[in-house]
Regions:
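Extended, highly charged accessory segments
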Residues: 225-228, 426, 468, 475-555, ...
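Short metal-coordination and nucleic-acid-contact micro-motifs, chiefly zinc-binding Cys/His arrays
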Residues: 697-701, 743-747, 851
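Short Cys/His-rich Zn2+-coordinating modules
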Residues: 681-692, 727-737, 836-842
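Short cysteine-rich loop/turn motifs with clustered Cys
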Residues: 688-720, 751-753
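Cys/His-coordinated zinc-binding microdomains
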Residues: 708, 755, 859-862
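Helicase motor core with emphasis on the C-terminal RecA-like subdomain
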Residues: 4, 8-51, 55-58, 62, ...
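Compositionally biased, low-complexity linear motifs
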Residues: 72-78, 126, 310, 733-739, ...
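Histidine-centered nuclease catalytic patch
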Residues: 708-749, 758-760
Length: 885
């Protein structure tokens, strides 16, 4: 069945069409050609002809001409538009003109580097055939963590064109630059592929690595030029210039041919309209993928997290296994990979994501190219430009977190002139539903800005350490455009890590600091996930490493008792050892997955900027975030119901970072309180509270009613209201409702850990909670960051006129959206500028949502027993109407 046949079947199916929120057809277009620049080396022109390339696309010719003028360029044409030739041609031209010239290609992943080397070798061999004296092919090499040690010295001696990633440049090449002296002295070009990936923490690290590279190049009297490529974002030129700290020329108009592409935005059907409950997106996406596979279309399915990808793989394989006993769709004619295979089975559907070992990834990539693998379920590891052939369909399960990533995933289908289809299956979450309702965000100008902050002091100090270990600093030397070099060198000198002799600064450590830091996070070395045999099962096999996770994420993803997915198999974490950086897991067969529960508290340190409106104050500044993983939920796979909540007790961590916040004025609080729409002040428990609290402690004999833990010396347990105090409607001076609320039957003594778990698992959501949910979920649409890059915290306010301390402003009700990176990366300042835009988007989201009391698509999930006076949607809407006025 062709793509057109499948689309016709979908169009004629009313059930399917009822789920379609948007269906956009992008017609195919022919190529627009231009001759190769006449200044291009004749041997290279002959090699292009030998490879069947008689002429270039116009944008390729423009890019090559700009590069040959020695301009830095950034190419932002779409996926499959021939960006590779835009940088290969000027690089190889330079090689032919200058026998000592070298080039460095940096890719964000190892897979991309290995993929590109094949095309490079093909072109280099064609050049060598035209001009045997060139001998370019032997000088091209990939250099990464998978490169065997015996090959590395040979590569250092022979390579002129090196394909690697920023991590290897950081940890292997720059610290050992003396061994690369000839290569660095001849460095003429640096290619940065997929620079939209270089944002946030990773991008800020990479910008500093490039500062170190350019500094070492100057030491060897080299001044390389840069060629960058990027997906569609709002600020590609700004990002490129921030990364390399030089001016760049943008090439953005594509003249490559393209086939017709259908983009479908699909909303999962409502199961309970009143509660806003929708069918699980993973089930909908798995069904769509199975339909595409049955139609004979090679299909890629994207999940936006490891857990989602592995759930999709499990559901898709299970569905194929159920059909195994009856004939299925044959493989496409001409596929020799499986000549005797008559139907697709579970073995032909593979997973692919970060954390898989290199051999697994290479095997899957080869299977996709050969056609043996009919479908792959991936995270964003395959959203990049790896050449895995012409996939006909892409199913994207859940909004990937950025518009650029969405189009990258759409672009995996239709990398030829054939017709293709890509479907975005929305989850019930707020961001997904907002994008589904506002398709202009996808189909018109992207609002996303990729932000980096190379001068984040935490990162800058680490990279100055590396730089001074690589080459001593002179007093008057610069480190890129950073204004803080002198301060950082003074700090390192004071700490004894750097010694000053006259006008020069020298590294005094024994080890190179690059080995002690990762570019992918601020969490240091990763936590290794290893499979172990269950205890007491006789002879035990040696542990087998099956994946890894960064330290910051480890308590959230591989805590004790967590279910970890890999290759469609469930594993249960037996023990997480954060000291040894190891998580031991065993294979299990369970029908649930897990979700960590964390508790946090935010303290305001410094306000950098703020402005007042009639009903609110907005600001951004520095905060301290105290966070702890305190438990986890078991959630049934099929129904997504919570099966149980279990305690954990990991070390409380403090993060000093930046935050944006919105503070509610006393006037708004008072207006909402009078209307019965404000439940976000800290409770005044009434005049008998001290007496009742003491009575509960005596009754329960100082032991937690949940876990039985006794009170520690000098630290009392908390007293918890079983029915929330605020539901009794106590107003001091007007009624005595506190007497009913504070009955001993409604009170229980609980330790602080159990209290946090009770509050987190079952606390009713208020208007501030709804506002927090909206702001934190909408922010990534404008920031081009992952939702996990931001945290949110609600600070309850003191009752009007009854502040706990004289400085009432420190106890005003606030919603903080904070960055999960030490010192921040600039997101908070951007959110501060976007405050009114965010409020209006939040108000529109609540007003347009069809649910009654609140749901994940607007103010967040609400409890089934949420009292009528605490309808989160009603409270949030009332608050937003005043804030956005």
């Amino acid at each position: 069945m062709s793509v057109a046949d499948l689309l016709a079947r979908w169009r004629s199916n009313p059930q399917f069409m009822n789920k379609v929120a948007a269906w956009r057809i992008f017609p195919g277009s022919p190529a627009v050609y231009a001759p190769a620049p006449p200044s291009l080396h004749p041997a290279l022109q002959g090699a292009l002809a030998a490879c069947g390339i008689q002429q270039l696309y116009v944008h390729q010719s423009e890019a090559v001409e700009a590069a040959l003028r020695q301009e830095n360029i950034v190419i932002t044409t779409p996926t499959a538009s021939g960006k590779t030739l835009c940088y290969n041609l000027p690089v190889l031209h330079t090689f032919l003109a200058e026998p000592a010239a070298c080039a460095l290609y940096l890719f964000p992943t190892k897979a991309l580097a290995h993929d590109q080397i094949e095309e490079l070798n093909r072109l280099a061999k064609a050049i060598d055939a035209v001009d045997p004296t060139a001998r370019l092919a032997p000088s091209i090499a990939a250099y990464d963590g998978d490169t065997p040690m015996p090959q590395r010295s040979r590569i250092r001696k022979r390579a002129r064109l090196l394909l690697t990633n920023p991590d290897m440049l950081h940890v292997s090449i720059l610290p050992n630059h003396a061994q690369w002296a000839d290569f660095l002295a001849g460095l003429r070009w640096v290619v940065l592929d997929e620079i939209h990936i270089y944002r946030g923490v990773f991008g800020s690290h990479v910008a500093n690595v490039l500062r170190r590279l350019q500094r070492i190049c100057r030491h060897y009297s080299a001044t390389p030029r840069f060629i960058c490529t990027s997906a569609t974002i709002a600020n590609p030129t700004q990002l490129a210039e921030r990364l390399i700290e030089q001016r760049v020329h943008q090439i953005e108009r594509s003249t490559a041919p393209r086939g017709e592409k259908h983009i479908i935005l699909l909303n999962t059907p409502l199961v309970d309209a009143e509660k806003g409950v929708r069918r699980a997106a993973v089930l909908e996406a798995a069904d769509l993928a199975a339909e595409c596979i049955d139609a004979g279309l090679q299909t890629i399915v994207f999940g936006r997290s490891r857990v989602a990808a592995e759930l999709l793989l499990t559901y898709l394989r299970a569905g194929l296994e159920r059909r195994r006993s009856r004939p299925g769709q044959p493989f496409p004619a001409g596929n020799q990979a499986v000549p005797n295979q008559t139907f697709v089975t579970a073995e032909h559907v593979q997973g692919y994501r970060g954390g898989y070992l290199p051999a697994e990834r290479r095997s899957i990539e080869a299977g996709l190219r050969s056609g043996l693998v009919r479908s792959v379920v991936a995270t964003n590891a395959l959203e990049l430009g790896i050449d895995i052939g012409g996939l006909a369909a892409a199913i994207v399960c859940g909004y990937p977190g950025s518009i650029a990533a969405t189009w990258q995933q759409f672009g995996r289908a239709g990398r030829t002139t054939d017709a293709a289809v890509a479907v975005l299956v929305a989850t019930a979450g707020l961001l997904d539903q907002y994008v589904i309702r506002h398709s202009e965000f996808l189909f018109e100008q992207s609002p996303e800005h990729a932000l980096i902050h190379p001068d984040n002091l935490m990162l800058l100090v680490d990279h100055v350490r590396c730089a001074v270990a690589e080459l001593p600093f002179h007093r008057d030397e610069a480190f890129g455009a950073s204004p803080y070099l002198a301060d950082v060198l003074a700090l390192l000198t004071e700490q004894g890590e750097v010694q000053r002799h006259g006008d020069r600064f020298f590294w005094s450590g024994l080890r190179h600091p690059a080995r002690e830091m990762s570019l992918r996070s601020v969490g240091g070395e990763p936590v290794i996930i290893q499979q172990v045999e269950p205890a007491g099962e006789g002879e035990r096999n040696a542990p087998c490493v099956i994946g890894e996770v960064d330290q910051v994420s480890a308590p959230l993803l591989v805590h004790d008792g967590a279910i970890y997915f890999h290759g469609g198999q469930s594993y249960q974490v037996q023990r997480l050892d954060l000291t040894a950086l190891r998580a031991d897991v065993t294979a299990v067969d369970v029908d649930y997955y897990t979700e960590a529960i964390s508790d946090s508290e935010v303290k305001l340190l410094t306000c950098h900027a703020g402005r007042s409106a009639e009903n609110s104050l907005t600001a951004w500044g520095d905060v301290a975030v105290h966070a702890q993983v305190i438990g986890y939920r078991k959630i049934k796979r099929t129904t997504h119901e919570t099966l149980g909540v279990y305690p954990l007790d990991y070390t409380r961590r403090t993060l000093e970072t930046s935050a944006y916040w919105c503070e509610i004025t006393p006037a708004v609080q008072q207006e909402l309180e009078v209307a019965g729409l404000w439940f976000d002040s800290v409770n005044d428990y009434g005049p008998n509270w001290v007496e009742q609290r003491a009575a509960v402690r005596a009754r329960d004999r100082g032991r937690c009613a949940v876990c039985g833990a006794p009170e520690a010396p000098g630290r009392q347990h908390d007293v918890h209201h079983k029915i929330p105090f605020r539901l009794f409607g106590y107003v001091p001076g007007l009624n005595e409702a506190y007497l009913e609320a504070n009955r001993l039957e409604n009170l229980m003594l609980v330790c602080r850990g159990c209290h946090r778990r009770i509050e987190t698992a079952g606390r009713y959501q208020t208007g501030l909670d709804g506002l927090a949910y909206l702001l934190s979920n909408l922010a990534p649409l404008y920031l081009m960051c992952d939702p996990g890059d931001l945290g949110v915290y609600v600070e309850r306010g003191s009752p009007i006129g009854r502040a706990a301390v004289p400085d009432a402003r420190t106890h005003a009700p606030r919603v903080f959206v904070y960055e999960r990176v030490p010192a921040g990366l600039g997101f908070s300042a951007q959110l501060y500028d976007l405050h009114e835009t965010l409020l209006n988007a939040a108000l529109e989201s609540v007003r347009s949502c069809p649910c009654v009391h609140g749901c994940p698509a607007c103010v967040g999930p609400v409890l089934d027993d949420q009292p009528l006076q605490l309808q989160t949607k009603r409270l949030t809407l009332a608050l937003l109407e005043r804030l956005a006025a």
